[in-house]
Amino acid sequence: MTQFLTTAAGRRIAYHQTPGAGPGVVFLGGYRSDMTGTKAVHLQNWAESHGRGFLRFDYSGHGQSSGRFEEGGIGDWFADALAALEALTEGPQVLVGSSMGGWISLLVARALQGRVAGLVGIAAAPDFTADLMWDSYSDQQKALLTGQGWLAEPSEYSDQPNIITKTFLDDGSKHLVLRAPLNLPFPVRLLQGTADVDVPPSVALRLMDHATCPDLRLTLVKGADHRFSTPDCLDLMTATIEEVLRHA
């Protein structure tokens, strides 16, 4: 059953929680996705069958949570994730971050040291506002963003275009994790498809090279795309989480 958490910022965050043993598992979704996605629901079913505590939620402006998507940013969604973890979980947690959720997982891990027992990134996209958006734009696109404040981009996942605002990009620049030391003192596993055109494997390799971590491994899956939601990919995801839990 969907429940709601009202944060200190007044945002109403939709969530679904499965009670069970710890360390718990928390799923952090991607940009414009929600907690009814394939990976989130698959993980809930896995958690229920294994008696594992599990939390999935919608960032503000996503899914059933309050707010308009166009008015949110990395800082808001990071704050939502922190609020959800602090209010709804106890003890150590394993974070599972998909795409943008991988970036937010890293921000949470940095902020809640001692609460994070492990991290699984699925096509993790740290710093994507800078590296995969702004740096890839033409001079004309940058001029549009600077002048009118927004840019419309076609989306492969929706009939509606992505509206990218200069405010969103500027907010992202305040939360970059690959420009300063990144200490991850727990098991980290990165899962990445070789056919991912949204977040290429080079991002995972850069994260792997940048982070200081005693136990970090990257698994590349040939032919897997950004969704990483085929039955084989989902099985690999749960097997990887189980491995992290054994080492947590």
Which stretches of residues belong to each language-model region?
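Short beta-strand element of the alpha/beta-hydrolase
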Residues: 22-30
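The serine-hydrolase catalytic nucleophile loop
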Residues: 31-44, 202
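Catalytic nucleophile-loop/oxyanion-hole region of alpha/beta-hydrolase
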Residues: 63-88
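The alpha/beta-hydrolase serine catalytic core
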Residues: 115-220, 225-248
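N-terminal cap/lid segment of alpha/beta-hydrolase-fold proteins
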Residues: 1-19
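Short beta-strand immediately N-terminal to the catalytic nucleophile in serine-hydrolase-like folds
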Residues: 95-97, 122
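Gly/Ala-rich beta-loop-alpha elbow adjacent to hydrolase catalytic centers
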Residues: 97-105
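Conserved alpha/beta-hydrolase
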Residues: 42-66
